[in-house]
């Protein structure tokens, strides 16, 4: 079976508030799908359920055809996540960070995997540097290496280039493009960077009020809504108080 992650009739409620309401989508092997929406629309809750960290009120998440709620331990070893809001242990070196994380996942040939990712992400010269002394761009690349240390088949990215300078952001995007081509991986990219989404994603999910209100390729969405670019489509989504379709 090819690698994939599928969300089926997924909902999450907190008391009387419905944070995510009956959403459906699938990310196939070797595909990056973008998730766009304003703050508070349900993106983070969706990612939490996809990772098995939040229990859905209704629906299910299938990873490679298996329900994550019923196969959580085995499936989480095939998944990983990156967010700029999760800090690295400041007193550990880069190498120590990768070793600790690799051992959590029981990674075979851990040293070889560290060497591979360090080369790809230009970490070789800072492997023995303490993480707390790194620049934001260096920390971002270390976080990405940690997220790939277990060679995941599913990768969930929450604002992976937030707060990065243009050069470092472009390096990370180029790395993700190449990594996807070289590895059989399904990727969800939640981002507010429209150029990033258009460059990396084969399709885009537009989310508002906990609902997927539209989806399609970036070019399809631009044409459908008669806009000049994806940013204008996003602004239409945010500003339109009525149904967006």
Give the label of every model feature segment.
Residues 130-134:
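Conserved ABC ATPase signature
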Residues 170-182:
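Helical segment within the ABC ATPase nucleotide-binding domain
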Residues 151:
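Conserved catalytic motifs of ABC-family nucleotide-binding domains
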Residues 155-158:
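Catalytic Walker B motif of ABC-type/P-loop ATPase nucleotide-binding domains
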Residues 215-216:
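ABC ATPase "signature
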